[in-house]
């Protein structure tokens, strides 16, 4: 297993992949959170020749607590550093216990499968998030392989139905 890959050896996130990830997150905002305006954006300019990391943020229009998401895709120093990862750096939803967290994780699993991201990591979760993570199947290390996460979500949703 490689400990750390050089920038030029790591798989690049090409411009079309960057755009499609952003569109998928934007669609999540529109269909799940009922946001009508463009609320998510790539925090750096899309790289024509690809990039090893992509940051997607959301912003709030108005005062008060709004839906807030900060995601990173690509090369990070967590787990196996030779594989593409998804990192949930910040997440907060105005409405809690509405299924938004589960829906976001399902969306991220779809992105992971489509673009060969191997694992999802949640950085510095608060107590509410830790409780949710435990229900979904996360352990103390705060990351799961995408395929395991997808299975865990299906099991979680199945348990909730009964």
Regions found by a protein language model. Give the residues of each.
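Non-catalytic substrate-recognition and accessory regions of acyl/acetyltransferase enzymes
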Residues: 1-98, 106-162
């Amino acid at each position: 297993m490689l400990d750390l890959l050089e920038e030029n050896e790591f798989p690049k996130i090409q411009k079309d992949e960057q755009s499609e990830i952003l569109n998928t997150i934007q669609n999540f905002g529109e269909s799940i959170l009922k946001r009508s305006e463009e609320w998510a954006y790539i925090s750096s300019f899309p790289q024509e020749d690809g990039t090893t990391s992509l940051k997607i943020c959301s912003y709030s229009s108005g005062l008060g607590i709004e839906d807030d998401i900060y995601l990173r895709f690509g090369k990070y120093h967590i787990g196996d550093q030779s594989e593409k990862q998804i990192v949930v750096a910040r997440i907060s939803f105005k409405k809690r216990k509405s299924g938004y967290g589960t829906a976001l994780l399902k969306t991220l699993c779809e992105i992971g499968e489509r673009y060969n991201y191997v694992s999802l990591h949640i950085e510095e979760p608060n107590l509410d998030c830790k409780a949710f993570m435990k229900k979904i199947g996360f352990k103390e290390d705060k990351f799961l392989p995408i395929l395991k996460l997808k299975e865990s979500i299906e099991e979680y949703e199945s348990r909730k139905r009964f």
